[in-house]
């Protein structure tokens, strides 16, 4: 277990319905090769791409409220990553934290196919921790986690897709 990570396996109800709804209704940005993206809430600049303000969908507002109640902050942005299948991946990285409100981190809600989230210690790269992220789960990382660990979504042997809803409170 990593200090600064909160993991809740069954955080939301009906993750399969939400997966199908978002997959079909979101206008996906396809500028990234490895995955499709979308952003809701406060304007956000991510990986040299600008996402303008877009109002939260009601389904995202419900999750926002639950994060506020459970973790203790109300996100104002949700960056969504859609991994179409197991070939879609994300390499080791730390998220940008200087744009986050003090005392907040990043909450990730997973829907669709279960995937692994691997953490690698920046100072001791051989220290790797793995969290399984089934549909409906939440993993929350404090800013301190980002300073000590990098995380990645490795390739997986599946034809099914996964959507990660990454909630932040941007300054």
Language model: regions and residue ranges:
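Non-heme Fe(II) oxygenase metal-center motifs and adjacent flexible, charged/small-residue loops
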Residues: 1-171
């Amino acid at each position: 277990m990593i200090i600064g990570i909160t993991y809740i396996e069954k955080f939301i109800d009906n993750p399969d319905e939400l997966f199908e709804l978002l997959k079909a209704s979101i206008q996906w940005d396809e500028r990234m090769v490895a995955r499709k993206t979308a952003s809701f809430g406060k304007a956000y600049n991510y990986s040299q791409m600008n996402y303008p303000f877009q109002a939260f969908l009601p389904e995202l507002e419900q999750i926002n409220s639950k994060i506020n109640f459970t973790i203790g902050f109300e996100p104002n942005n949700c960056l969504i990553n859609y991994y179409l299948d197991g070939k879609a991946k994300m390499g080791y990285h730390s998220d940008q934290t200087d744009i986050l409100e003090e005392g907040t981190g990043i909450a990730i809600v997973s829907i669709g196919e279960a995937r692994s989230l691997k953490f690698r210690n920046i100072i001791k790269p051989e220290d790797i921790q793995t969290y399984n992220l089934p549909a409906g789960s939440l993993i929350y990382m404090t800013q301190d986690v980002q300073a000590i660990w990098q995380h990645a979504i490795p390739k997986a042997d599946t034809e099914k897709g996964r959507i990660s809803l990454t909630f932040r409170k941007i300054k």
